Amino acid sequence: MGARWPVLPTVLTALAVPAMVGLGVWQLQRAAWKESVLVRLAANAAAPVLVLGEAPIPRDAAFRQVVLWLDCPPVPPTPSGARLASGQAGFGWRLSCRAGNGSFVSVTLGASASPLDASAARALGEEASARSIWRGMLVERSNGAPGWLLVSRDALGPLAPAKAPGLESIPNNHRGYAIQWFAFAGTLAAIYAAWLARWRRARTG
């Protein structure tokens, strides 16, 4: 005589469906948190220029226009992917500089449509080392790297101003993820209910 109830499928479904619903609720909570962050960053972007000088950079300074003092080494900057202020794709040129409190700030000196030769890159580094006052937008570095990125408002040498990241560059897909988890839970529950109905018919048929 077979089992009166399909224990294993029932237990697995009873564990999986609440877990998926819980993940959906968690994503909704993350969405609310991300939306509050975006509101704060939008306020930062619209705020007046923050003159820091040699003071430490506040932790909530992302997307603020700032003026700060930096000590940059006379070395060639490194290239990175960037866009010119016009929107054209090109090369960004970054240099790691030291702020007044000893922390490091990666500075985007500007952007170019094509690579720079070695002599032009050396000249950029020398020009950057001669400057102490920097103006631009602060953003958090990508890929979880520590420290800040300053997108300089005033391009150096032959460079054009680089396009600073906008709020649209910050993903906010949590509500979509929540819908997916709720859909997974509903689909699994429906599949289990249909399978259970067939299982019962097979036992009574």
Q: What spans do the regions from the language model cover?
A:
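Surface-exposed, charge/polar-rich loops and edge strands
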Residues: M1-G205
